[in-house]
Regions:
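Short, Lys/Arg-rich, polar N-terminal cytosolic tail immediately upstream
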Residues: 1-7
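Membrane-proximal helix-loop-helix interfaces that form the catalytic/acceptor-binding platform
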Residues: 10-367, 377-521
Length: 524
């Protein structure tokens, strides 16, 4: 970093190039992967249509759809309701996340610059923009990138408060926390320990006025924003069979050893943030373990040696965030009791910032040490970190260029249309109906008569039906005049309804066989 400072490169150039890189990575193949189930669910919860939405839901208002088919607070849908009034297309819908991601990147740059320096901030933006799982959510129309964006700016305000306490900053922090929790329930794992930590900090610093103001603002926020969120959204959403708020299953502890389970959970979260579900992840899990313990060791080292109170406070905050998250998730209260998935994305911005700061502070501590051998190691450490980050960026860029299409209903609908599928009875299963309806109704050839032969299944319970139950369901609810000789089935796999029809003599042809399926079943 010392060599870079000597170059006297203007900040607008270094930062500008990093931001341009973000835009390149974010816009690259933005709509290459089709919009899938969750994005379409968000879409139909964000359009102010009155009345049932054919093939999607019988709920007649935007509020009912958010309260009974969603699993999140309403802020994202409110924003998308406005965004989609400007334009309604697949690209524009996804582009909203790119814009939020850019605001997140600006916040990240400012946070890292504040804690480290502008060159570390620049490198952080490059790395941030090359992480596959992050760019996946930048290219997905969902609340997750909004959550990341808001949490980064929450950290930025948190650092300003630790630097200098003011009543205005304390109140702004409370407001931002409310916005966070109205974006995603997982934000509570961050804002609760952070808010309590600041409350203690106000008291210990002798800022009694700020303490009481903050405490009152917390109470007002809890009553004025928390109770409505609980009553109008959390409680109705908890009745959803696929709700993430509570799981009816035994508590699982790895090896019946709580210590092992704790570190295993840490590893799963770190691995997911670094690699997502890479097919080679199992082969290099040992590498993740090494990285995990190296980071833990460096974190302890930095906490003991650094003179920056902001860094020490942020490390303590991260410890409390994960401890609370670990306990709640292990008890199956959150995220089905699983670690290492999108429901822990609230941890991503905190850990990213923490890792960047730990690496930077480690180099600075070695550089400022009285021991010559530590000073001599400093340039090699800096070069090693930069090379490691560039190699990681290369891996991330490779993953991003091979963006995975979760559920390719775009191909299913276009093939179905090309094969005159509207003339054949078509059964769309529960999890595929959102995206099927989206691509059907956004097709340039769409007309109301397309619905004449389509049945979209809105009954979740049918997923576990036996062959006999399926046939009974089809005959009673879908085809009361008798099963047709030809049926298209839109599914995500060779599922139970296909098996049931095959059991009574239908022969199956896989017309589309990708991450979504279009089966043609015919009686012979």
């Amino acid at each position: 970093m010392k060599a870079l400072n000597k170059l006297k490169v203007p900040e607008w150039i270094t930062a500008g190039l990093a931001f341009i890189y973000y835009w390149i990575m974010a816009l690259y193949k933005l709509t290459n992967a089709p919009i899938w189930q969750d994005e379409c669910m968000e879409y139909y919860c964000s359009i102010p249509v009155k009345g049932a939405i054919r093939g999607v839901t019988q709920y007649t208002t935007m509020y009912e759809r958010m309260a009974y088919i969603q699993q999140q607070p309403p802020l994202y849908n409110w924003l998308m309701c406005i965004w989609l009034q400007i334009h309604d297309s697949e690209w524009w819908y996804r582009f909203s996340s790119v814009v939020m991601g850019f605001i997140a990147v600006i916040g990240l740059y400012l946070v890292i610059k504040k804690l480290c320096d502008r060159f570390t901030a620049t490198l952080s933006v490059y790395v941030f923009s090359s992480i596959y799982i992050l760019m996946y959510y930048v290219k997905e129309a969902s609340e997750y990138i909004l959550l990341i964006m808001l949490l980064i700016w929450t950290v930025y305000l948190y650092l300003f408060i630790v630097e200098k306490i003011t009543v205005k900053r304390a109140v702004l922090f409370t407001i931002l926390c409310v916005v966070d929790i109205y974006t995603h329930y997982g934000a509570v794992f961050v804002i609760v320990p952070m808010a309590l930590q600041l409350l203690v900090y106000y008291w210990r610093s002798g800022e009694k006025k700020t303490f009481w103001t903050a405490l009152v603002s917390y109470i007002i926020a809890g009553v004025g924003a928390g109770i409505p969120l609980l009553y109008f959204y959390m409680l109705p959403q908890s009745t959803n069979p696929i709700s993430t708020l509570g799981a009816d299953k035994p508590i699982e502890i790895t090896g019946n050893n709580i210590i092992l389970d704790f570190f295993d959970s840490l590893m799963w979260v770190l691995r997911w943030c670094m690699l997502d579900y890479d097919r080679d992840a199992e082969k290099i899990t040992w590498t993740i373990w090494i990285i995990l313990f190296a980071l833990l060791g460096l974190g302890i080292f930095v906490y003991r040696k650094t003179h920056k109170k902001e860094v020490r406070a942020f490390i303590r905050c991260n410890i409390w965030v994960f401890l609370i998250y670990y306990v709640i998730t292990t008890l199956n209260i959150y995220a089905y009791g699983w670690f290492g998935n999108r429901y822990n994305l609230f941890i991503f911005p905190l850990w990213f910032i923490l890792i960047a700061v730990i690496l930077y502070e480690t180099v600075q501590i070695f550089k400022e040490s009285d021991r010559q051998w530590m000073q001599k190691l400093t340039p090699f450490m800096s070069i090693g970190i930069v090379i490691a980050m560039l190699l990681y960026c290369t891996y991330g860029d490779y993953r991003i260029s091979n963006h995975w299409a979760k559920s390719d209903l775009r191909t299913v609908v276009s093939t179905w249309r090309a094969d005159d599928g509207e003339e054949v009875p078509t059964f769309v299963n529960f999890h595929q109906r959102y995206a099927f309806v989206y691509y059907l109704t956004h097709s340039k050839d769409y007309q109301e008569s397309d619905w004449n032969q389509i049945y979209c299944n809105e009954t979740l319970e049918t997923l576990g039906y036996s062959n006999e139950e399926w046939i009974e369901f089809l005959e009673a609810n879908v085809y009361p005049d008798g099963l047709p000789t030809q049926i298209y089935v839109v599914s995500g796999q060779h599922d139970t309804v296909v098996g049931a029809l095959e059991s009574i003599g239908y022969q199956t042809t896989a017309v589309v066989d990708t991450t979504a399926k279009l089966f043609l079943l015919e009686q012979k």
